Amino acid sequence: MGKYIRKSKIDGAGAGAGGGGGGGGGGESSIALMDVVSPSSSSSLGVLTRAKSLALQQQQQRCLLQKPSSPSSLPPTSASPNPPSKQKMKKKQQQMNDCGSYLQLRSRRLQKKPPIVVIRSTKRRKQQRRNETCGRNPNPRSNLDSIRGDGSRSDSVSESVVFGKDKDLISEINKDPTFGQNFFDLEEEHTQSFNRTTRESTPCSLIRRPEIMTTPGSSTKLNICVSESNQREDSLSRSHRRRPTTPEMDEFFSGAEEEQQKQFIEKYNFDPVNEQPLPGRFEWTKVDD
């Protein structure tokens, strides 16, 4: 447990220990004392525990703050934990600053610019293109009317005329890139006229029924009506086909009926056609109503 130390006076100053244990000094030098359980001492003093050592350290820190003394005079047990150095503090601050700057840069990267400017620019470009097309081609449908007129007049040369005007339109579009908006309407009407010219030039041998030929330039509604009428005629012709007569039906099912009757007679010794019992395994009796 340690060595026994008796209370003594050093340089006229008294040094003593009391209670749970402590150290005091007077004059120039002082010595720290530690309570040890002696056989003569009472059992109330107890043993130095962790709680007591922590209380001693706190008390010594308070004394050092009130009356600072030289580090050589302090006992080794009462030495307070070394405070963190300035370099460590600086490193921690730099790490915190680095983390903050990294987060700021990351948040800046994630930010997106609003697309309002892009939308406005596209609208302005569309308006400029429309104005340019109106200025360069004030009536684009006049060309279409001429194309349709040429296609309806000619029968054999219509396809060549249409293809020639297609080439002219393509060359105009390549020269003027802003002609794309009106080109969709031109293409739709132009395909209609092209289909009409091809209808006029189709030979009759390709058609299944030459009686139902339609005039060139007719709408698709007439073709739909004709197809529906053809379907009705086919259904009526199928319904009016020759149906089998009753003797033919009897001849068709007679073989299967005879086989079933034979099997029934052999099994139950009863004639189902004449409704008469036959000699055999079962005995049949008539039930009175």
UniProtKB/Swiss-Prot annotation:
In what ranges is there compositional bias, type Gly residues?
A: 13-28
Query: What are its GO cellular component terms?
Result: cytoplasm; nucleoplasm; nucleus
Q: Which UniProt keywords apply?
A: Cell cycle, Nucleus, Protein kinase inhibitor
Q: Where is the composition biased (Polar residues)?
A: 134-144
Tissue-specific expression: Expressed in leaves and flowers and at lower levels in roots.
Biased-composition ranges for Low complexity? 56-80
GO molecular function terms noted in the UniProt entry: cyclin-dependent protein serine/threonine kinase inhibitor activity
Query: Which BP terms from GO are recorded?
Result: negative regulation of cell cycle; negative regulation of cyclin-dependent protein serine/threonine kinase activity
Pfam families from the UniProt entry: CDI
Q: State whether keyword Nucleus applies.
A: yes
Among InterPro entries, the record links this protein to:
CDI_dom, CDI_dom_sf, KRP
Disordered: region residues: 1-31, 56-160, 227-248
Give compartment(s).
Nucleus, Nucleoplasm
User: Per the similarity annotation, which family is this?
Assistant: Belongs to the CDI family. ICK/KRP subfamily.
Q: What is the role of this chain?
A: Binds and inhibits CYCD2-1/CDKA-1 complex kinase activity. May target specifically CDKA-1.
What binding partners and quaternary form does the record give?
Answer: Specifically interacts with CDKA-1, but not with CDKB1-1. Interacts with CYCD4-1. Binds to FBL17.
Protein known as = Cyclin-dependent kinase inhibitor 4
What species is given as this protein's source? Arabidopsis thaliana (Mouse-ear cress)
